[in-house]
């Protein structure tokens, strides 16, 4: 048997030095952004009972959950999602609070992936939820809050798509498709597989009908700005579908009027987890990353499964993908190389610690040199790209940033 003590499990990773500092700073920026606009932070345990996630229409399959047993044989899981524990907390501990309730969180989730697919199994999410409020203002609020928070991290090149599962459901309700066939079609549309969509509709035209076929055939192409809504309206007379489109238009208008229209798009072909989400859905992308920057939507039925039937909406930002999307200039700002190493001879060691304390109080990073002479201290700074040396013996900075800040 191979000894694995020097290895880590597939899908996990060690985060070191600069990357760790940048990630921590991003988490703090997001966290403070939420708190500053009225969100209260909560934390749920990493371990939850499997029953918490064994729900009707749960979007995360049990095959993706890491499972283990407690000392009484009960099944536990490493939480694969943050929203479901929020629903549990709200239904069991927060019934007497004033609603709407605005909650935020930052934490790791764990999802098992197929072998050798290159995906991370431990993901850091930072998210917000608004519970107990069905107004469109709540959906707009979470999108606007997320946009503002992401902008504060320094990321500018990103988009958030708005979808509407009720539009797809309304069109499907006019067909005679069985649930299994509906799921196949949904998957083709979600993945923008145009040829498969066309093939499926032609093969099942007698069950779908001419009017619905026209809408469903165009659904993968209904992507872009506000004009997408007008195109969709011209394709159907279904009243529920028209009402669903109105919500998309109204949400788009609110976000645009708030000054963030350049960051949003509409994608009516975004139809993931149609039995979990109950209306508007959101998904964010950033230049240079293949996976979602954020995801979320309205999930009015979730809390009812915990015995507390109230509406809810929210989203989660993938912190790891956000960090990966940052350009070098932003990363430099998040990981300052303006550091000091304070040197002092052995007889003046107390001066070194006094100098470090003073520099720290001024908001500067500083550390005491562990070396016995200044030459070894200089070498240490060059190798670690530390910008300045402060000599506590002389009270002078003897290494300039322009020289020792570059290797």
Curated annotation (Swiss-Prot):
Listed InterPro entries: aa-tRNA-synth_II, aa-tRNA-synth_II/BPL/LPL, HisRS-like_core, HisRS/HisZ, HisZ
Any one GO molecular function term: transferase activity
Keyword hit for Ribonucleoprotein: no
Entry's localization field: Cytoplasm
Annotated Gene Ontology cellular component terms: cytoplasm
Pfam families attached to this UniProt entry: tRNA-synt_His (PF13393)
GO biological process entries: histidyl-tRNA aminoacylation; L-histidine biosynthetic process
Listed pathway(s): Amino-acid biosynthesis; L-histidine biosynthesis; L-histidine from 5-phospho-alpha-D-ribose 1-diphosphate: step 1/9
Keywords per UniProt: Amino-acid biosynthesis, Cytoplasm, Histidine biosynthesis
Subunit-level organization: Heteromultimer composed of HisG and HisZ subunits.
Family: Belongs to the class-II aminoacyl-tRNA synthetase family. HisZ subfamily.
Role played: Required for the first step of histidine biosynthesis. May allow the feedback regulation of ATP phosphoribosyltransferase activity by histidine.
Any further remark recorded for this protein: This function is generally fulfilled by the C-terminal part of HisG, which is missing in some bacteria such as this one.
Protein name: ATP phosphoribosyltransferase regulatory subunit
Organism: Clostridium acetobutylicum (strain ATCC 824 / DSM 792 / JCM 1419 / IAM 19013 / LMG 5710 / NBRC 13948 / NRRL B-527 / VKM B-1787 / 2291 / W)
Name of the gene this protein is made from: hisZ
């Amino acid at each position: 048997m191979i000894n694995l003590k020097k290895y880590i499990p597939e899908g996990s990773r060690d985060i070191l030095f600069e990357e760790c500092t940048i990630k921590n700073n991003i988490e703090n920026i997001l966290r403070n952004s939420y708190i500053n606009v009225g969100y209260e932070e909560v934390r749920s345990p990493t371990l939850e009972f499997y029953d918490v996630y064994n729900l009707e229409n749960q979007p995360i399959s049990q095959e993706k959950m890491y499972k283990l047993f407690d000392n009484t044989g009960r099944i536990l899981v490493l939480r694969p999602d943050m929203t479901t524990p929020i629903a549990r907390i709200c239904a069991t501990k927060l019934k007497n609070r004033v609603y709407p309730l605005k909650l935020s969180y930052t934490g790791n989730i764990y999802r098992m992936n197929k072998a050798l697919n290159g995906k991370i199994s431990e993901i850091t999410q930072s998210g917000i939820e608004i519970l107990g409020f069905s107004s469109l203002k709540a959906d707009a609020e979470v999108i606007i809050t997320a946009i503002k928070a992401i902008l504060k991290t320094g990321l500018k090149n990103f988009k958030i798509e708005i979808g509407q599962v009720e539009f797809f459901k309304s069109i499907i309700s006019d067909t005679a498709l069985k649930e299994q066939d509906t799921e196949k079609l949904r998957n083709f549309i979600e993945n923008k597989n145009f040829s498969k969509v066309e093939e499926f509709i032609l093969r099942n035209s007698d069950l779908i009908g001419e009017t619905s076929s026209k809408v469903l055939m165009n659904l993968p192409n209904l992507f872009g700005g506000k004009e997408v809504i007008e195109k969709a309206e011209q394709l159907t007379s279904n009243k529920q579908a028209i009402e669903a489109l109105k919500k998309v238009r109204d949400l788009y208008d609110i976000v645009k009027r708030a000054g963030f229209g350049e960051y949003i798009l509409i994608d009516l072909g975004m139809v993931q987890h149609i039995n979990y989400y109950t209306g508007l859905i959101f998904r964010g992308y950033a230049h240079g990353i293949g996976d979602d920057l954020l995801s979320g939507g309205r999930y009015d039925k979730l809390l009812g499964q915990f015995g507390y039937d109230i509406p809810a909406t929210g989203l989660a930002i993938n912190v790891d993908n956000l960090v990966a999307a940052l350009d070098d200039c932003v990363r430099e700002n998040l990981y300052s190389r303006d550091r000091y190493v304070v040197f002092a001879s052995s007889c003046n060691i107390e001066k070194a610690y006094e100098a470090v304390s003073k520099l720290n109080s001024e908001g500067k990073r500083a550390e005491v040199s562990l070396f016995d002479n200044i030459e070894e201290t200089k070498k240490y700074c060059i190798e670690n790209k530390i910008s300045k040396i402060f000599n506590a013996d002389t009270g002078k900075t003897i290494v300039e940033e322009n020289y020792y800040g570059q290797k």
